[in-house]
Amino acid sequence: MELQREQQGDKTVLTLPDDVTIYTVAELKEALSPLLHQGQVLELNLANVTEIDSAGLQLLLAAKKTALANGYPLHLVWHSYAVLELLELCQLSGFFGDPTLLPHAEHP
């Protein structure tokens, strides 16, 4: 799976697709894994995510834990409504430690 990747100084920004579910997480993990070991800050842009399930959430949790274990920060940015809703439902907003601001145009 080809993901939009942008280098911004000392960090890499990876934009996730609209579907982060059991049907796509294996491919997403394969694309994300090398970036977790590159030794620099990684941001996951979640603005495009319209569908996320427990498998997608597990991917985000595993990515965060791997980044922390490797000593490099991983930040979730531009949370979509679908992502915010799942994080709140599972009471995991605090785990990631990133501000969770909803873009103005995305309220239900």
Outline where the language-model segments fall.
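STAS-like cytosolic regulatory interaction modules
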Residues: 1-52, 62-108
